[in-house]
Amino acid sequence: MSWIERIKSNIAPTRKASIPEGVWTKCDSCGQVLYRAELERNLEVCPKCDHHMRMSARNRLHSLLDEGTMVELGSELEPKDLLKFRDSKKYKDRIASAQKETGEKDALVVMKGTLHEMPVVAAAFEFSFMGGSMGSVVGARFIRAVEQALEDNCPLICFSASGGARMQEALMSLMQMAKTSAALGKMQERGLPYISVLTDPTMGGVSASFAMLGDLNIAEPKALIGFAGPRVIEQTVREKLPPGFQRSEFLIQKGAIDMIVRRPEMRLKLASVLAKLMNLPAPSPDEPRESVVVPDQEPEA
């Protein structure tokens, strides 16, 4: 036996390090590898480049509303395949797949609660559910949110993240544009504030209806906001679009939105604006709140 073989025989093999899944993630913008817990503390905003990653509807609402005050509305509403629609896959199968993947029944989650002790109703889109597309259930839940705000005489906040109307529901989906817009007219008649927060992306029938009808339209940084996508527009007009076209920074220069607010500052900004609109005392800054993985719970109707 050679001296090299004698040394090798005395070396014990090391155990392969096991790293649990989900501990690290990668920023889609700068490519930086990030510690998942740090990213959650920063509300899914990259601490290196300030890129605002997509956030689940429940985590967004839980990071906005005061703890222990949240009650879900419209959770009993579920989508139905009334048209027996089928493209490359049956619509009912797409619904089942999206429900299994996200744990949600449809693409909009509505809750009532308090924001800095101020009663509010808040809605948020779950983009992972069929691209946050708007169907009959999304419209019905949004109207439920409006009705609850009217009943409680309180403001309504909606966080949009949608690709637009859900093609599998055809005309029933397009009807929601008119229904939701008409419902907001009742908020205006009562003088109750409706704040629309546009997140990445807010497109199609959602941007063409209630997402742009806020008394105040706020956007997150670099959010894609528009009706048709940039690629479709370029192919139609056969011209190169200007840099940053349809991004929130471009839109605020053109007067299409009112302000851009970073996600970690959103809770206090919304509370401050609503306090002014409702003639209430200005809220005090609170401790930074992190995004948490919300466990599955039986929601209250």
From Swiss-Prot:
Keywords on record: ATP-binding, Cytoplasm, Fatty acid biosynthesis, Fatty acid metabolism, Lipid biosynthesis, Lipid metabolism, Metal-binding, Nucleotide-binding, Transferase, Zinc, Zinc-finger
Purpose: Component of the acetyl coenzyme A carboxylase (ACC) complex. Biotin carboxylase (BC) catalyzes the carboxylation of biotin on its carrier protein (BCCP) and then the CO(2) group is transferred by the transcarboxylase to acetyl-CoA to form malonyl-CoA.
Q: Name one GO molecular function term.
A: ATP binding
Q: Which cofactor does it need?
A: Zn(2+)
Protein name per its UniProtKB record: Acetyl-coenzyme A carboxylase carboxyl transferase subunit beta
Q: Where is this region: Disordered?
A: 280-301
Q: Which Pfam families match?
A: Carboxyl_trans, Zn_ribbon_ACC
InterPro entries found in the cross-reference section: AcCoA_carboxyl_beta, Acetyl_CoA_COase_Trfase_b_su, ClpP/crotonase-like_dom_sf, COA_CT_N, Znf-ACC
- Supply the EC number(s): 2.1.3.15
Q: Where does Zn(2+) bind?
A: C27, C30, C46, C49
Q: What is the lineage of its organism?
A: Bacteria, Pseudomonadati, Pseudomonadota, Gammaproteobacteria, Enterobacterales
Whose protein is this, by species? Enterobacter sp. (strain 638)
The biological pathway it contributes to is: Lipid metabolism; malonyl-CoA biosynthesis; malonyl-CoA from acetyl-CoA: step 1/1
**Annotated CoA carboxyltransferase N-terminal domain residues:** 23-292
Single Gene Ontology BP term?
Answer: malonyl-CoA biosynthetic process
Predominant localisation class: cytoplasm
Q: Which gene specifies this protein's sequence?
A: accD
GO cellular-component term (any)? acetate CoA-transferase complex
Which EC main class describes this enzyme?
transferase
Belongs to which family?
A: Belongs to the AccD/PCCB family.
Q: Where in the cell is it found?
A: Cytoplasm
Free-text cofactor note: Binds 1 zinc ion per subunit.
Domain of life (superkingdom)? Bacteria
Q: Its quaternary structure?
A: Acetyl-CoA carboxylase is a heterohexamer composed of biotin carboxyl carrier protein (AccB), biotin carboxylase (AccC) and two subunits each of ACCase subunit alpha (AccA) and ACCase subunit beta (AccD).
Disulfide-linked positions: none
Renumbered zinc finger spans (C4-type): 27-49
